[in-house]
Amino acid sequence: MKKISFAVLMSFLCFISLVPTVDAAVIDHDKVVGFNEVVPTTISQKAEKKFQPYLKVYSGCVPFPAVDAQGNTSGGLQPSGSSKGDCSKHTGQVYSRSTWYNGVWAIMYAWYFPKDEPSPGLGHRHDWEGIVVWVDNPSNQNANVLSIAYSGHGKFTNVQPNVRNMKDTHPLIAYNSTWPINHELHISDQVGGTQPLIGWEDLTPAARNALNTTDFGKANVPFNDPHFTIHLEKAWFR
């Protein structure tokens, strides 16, 4: 019996060694197939959808998917030509991740842009920007937004929610550049667009691994394992 089990085990290991593996790759920015939204069923999924921001892009690229289900990541674009060259139209993707932080529910939303180019010759390949929506308790039917923190140049700025910067439960966010400074987020009073929402836990393991390990140059993935808590610390409002 032991000999049979050992033989079966060795055959299985040999089979595994012969199965071809597909390594994740860096691919063209417009070839990355984003994730479809999932039907929200958990408290965190429902809250992430409820408070999903609108994004108004005033200049530069619109959001693109950064990673696909197989873990392939976007190669981005060189900052050349028009600031929105080859990146002005796409369905896009918005990523989310939530947790309790200092007794407050934090929802981080993040967008990826293939390049950050204020004007030809300036900027860099890849851009990641994000916001943190601070909520009192996502379990409450009438959960309240306590503060909104938006990113820019490695820092976060907090603002209080009001009738001008919110549409119902959704923050109004702008993406823009004040020349010659690179792009950043701002609070807005204009309703922008939305993108398919995908949460960290709903990504495939390959996609999460890619976002944890891929070098996006001067841009950091704000919601991956190495940076998530660090960015929550920067975005804290009390």
What do the predicted segments below correspond to?
Residues M1-V8:
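Bacterial N-terminal signal peptides that target proteins for export
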Residues M10-S17:
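Bacterial N-terminal signal peptides
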Residues L18-A24:
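Sec/Tat signal peptide C-region and signal peptidase I cleavage site
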Residues A24-E129, N140, N144-R238:
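A domain-level signal for the mature, folded cores of soluble proteins
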Residues W134-P138:
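Short beta-strand micro-motifs enriched in acidic
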